Each structure stands twice: as structure tokens, then as C-alpha cells.
Design a protein with these regions (language model features):
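Compact, glycine-rich, soluble single-domain proteins
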Residues: 6-80
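Short, charged, intrinsically disordered terminal tails
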Residues: 1-4
Length: 80
């Protein structure tokens, strides 16, 4: 799909979300992160707070992270 990137949110117990998204917004240790398709590779800690997934149709899903890490690759985003 053009304009999307695969995103996985994984907790210690299970995979919470897996699918294509238009963007991801989360709070990194140094501030707000906005990730879109084609973003440069990144590994960052994330602070406790909402993780907002924007779908291709503009709808949003919001998850709560109690902290963790975000890994961004050209074709995938993983939040642990």
C-alpha cells in the first residue's frame, strides 16, 4: 500500500497491534516523535503515555504505553 508503513505494538505478553498505518505519534525520551512512511531508521526510548496510530483513511487508534522502545526501519515500525 502506498503511503503506509507496517506497525507492530508488542507487550511482554502478546502482540497488541499489527497492521499498516499512515503515521505513528509517540513521546520519545527527548520529545514528541512523528513517524511517517519513509522515515529514517531510528531507535529511541519512549515515555509512558499515548501512542497514536493514524490509519490510511484518517481514523485513529490510541494505545497506552507504560514506557519502552520504538524501532523505525524503512518498511516497519516496532514498539516494545
Amino acid at each position: 500500500m502506498a503511503g503506509t508503513v507496517h506497525c507492530s505494538i508488542v507487550s511482554a505478553e502478546q502482540e497488541v497491534f499489527s497492521g499498516d498505518v499512515a503515521s505513528v505519534v509517540a513521546t520519545g525520551t527527548l520529545g514528541e516523535l512523528g513517524i511517517h512512511p519513509g522515515h529514517t531508521a531510528l531507535l529511541s526510548g519512549i515515555k509512558a503515555g499515548p501512542v497514536r496510530l493514524v490509519m490510511e483513511d484518517g481514523s485513529e487508534e490510541i494505545f497506552f504505553a507504560s514506557g519502552g522502545f520504538i524501532e523505525v526501519q524503512p518498511t516497519a515500525i516496532t514498539i516494545l
